[in-house]
């Protein structure tokens, strides 16, 4: 993937930058919907007054889990291990998909999704998704769910085990051969 750069790393921008981030992806806490804000001190109160009632009231166990994650990250390198695993899965899917006759994809650089081109299959995105789920129990998301320019594409997630991804690729190879 690509390493993002924060404006806060520049001395002239540090006091003008608000950083908003979450724990869901970095620490695999999907669904807990907890995040944090790093802001210059003078912006804290207005920001809190504006959003405090909308985003407060998190369960104690979630706060404790986030505290442990932050404190243990330097010791265990959890984020780097997960990043390396996702990178391995991404490379596997991109290589396999691009080896097929009817499917292709670009190398994603900012998420754990593949936007697979299915135009050579002769199916619409909705038709492909229905076929994959009905015949093979393979769940995909039609690209049209992300806008009209998504026609001819389906989204695949690689936020799963390598074993599950290998099975998905096996199914995609079968579909590719059937076309």
Regions of interest found by a model, annotated:
Residues 1-179:
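PLP-dependent class I/II
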């Amino acid at each position: 993937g690509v390493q993002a750069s924060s404006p806060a790393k520049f001395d002239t921008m540090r006091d003008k930058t608000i950083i908003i981030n979450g724990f869901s992806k970095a620490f695999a806490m999907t669904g807990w919907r907890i995040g944090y804000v790093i802001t210059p001190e003078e912006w804290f109160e207005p920001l809190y007054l504006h959003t405090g009632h909308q985003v407060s009231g998190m369960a104690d166990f979630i706060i404790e889990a986030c505290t442990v994650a932050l404190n243990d990250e330097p010791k265990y390198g959890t984020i780097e291990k997960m990043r390396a695993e996702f990178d391995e899965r991404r490379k596997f899917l991109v290589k396999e998909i691009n080896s097929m006759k009817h499917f292709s994809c670009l190398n994603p650089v900012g998420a754990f999704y593949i936007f697979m081109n299915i135009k050579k299959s002769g199916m619409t995105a909705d038709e492909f998704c229905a076929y994959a789920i009905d015949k093979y129990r393979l769940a995909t998301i039609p690209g049209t769910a992300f806008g009209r320019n998504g026609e001819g594409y389906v989204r695949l997630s690689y936020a799963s085990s390598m074993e599950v991804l290998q099975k998905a690729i096996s199914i995609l190879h079968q579909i590719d051969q059937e076309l």
